[in-house]
Amino acid sequence: FNIHNFIAKEAVPVAIVMMIIGLNYASILTFLKPFAEQRHLLEASSYFFIFYAVASLITRPIAGRMIDAKNENVVVYPAFLALIITFVLLVFSYNGWVLLLAGVFLGIGYGNLSSSMQAIAIKVSPSSKYGIATSTYFIGLDIGIGFGPSLLGLFTDSITYTQVYLIMAIVAALCTVLYLIVHGRKVHGNTY
């Protein structure tokens, strides 16, 4: 057994960023329904992930071309901003259209972060480790999405869903800074 057969050390920083992004996403997967029930937005919430999927489907090909033409930062920073806006919109969603707009921003934010971070994990790794780098990326994502509901559930007795989403906006902002530190500041010009 050798850990390097399962983890690409070059991709670990990006996997950690993705773990935190996964935690953000898990908060929506876990709490959207009870949050929407509290706000009387249950019907609109049933369309939330359709709006997410359409926004992601439209923006991912554009983001891919932007990364190829420039570099990953031209997509990653706006995607982080979109993720932050997602949570701000959720906090202020008292009608269905605002909730659905949050779904659009989630598609732009999380949808593009997930594909961009996977590309970065591969980019920073030697070609002999592309498969392991992809695995490392998904380990980070799976930890965030898998343990996120349990971790966040520890606090839902003492804070509201609105407060959870406000905290997630702050976490997304801090994750942007973490990305800057572990990768973003190293990117200059066209890197592809």
Regions found by a protein language model. Name each.
Residues 42-43, 127-137:
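Loop-to-transmembrane helix entry/capping segments in MFS-fold secondary transporters
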Residues 74-89, 169:
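Structural signature of the two symmetry-related core transmembrane helices
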Residues 91-102:
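Helix-loop junctions at membrane interfaces in 12-TM secondary transporters
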Residues 53-61, 145-146:
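Residue-level signature of mid-helix packing/kink "hotspots" within the transmembrane helices
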Residues 11-49, 57:
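Extracytoplasmic gate region of multi-pass secondary transporters
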Residues 112-125:
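Intracellular juxtamembrane helix-capping segments at the cytosolic ends
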Residues 154-172:
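A membrane-interface helix-boundary motif in multi-pass transporters
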Residues 59-71, 156-157:
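Helix-to-loop junctions at the C-terminal end of transmembrane segments
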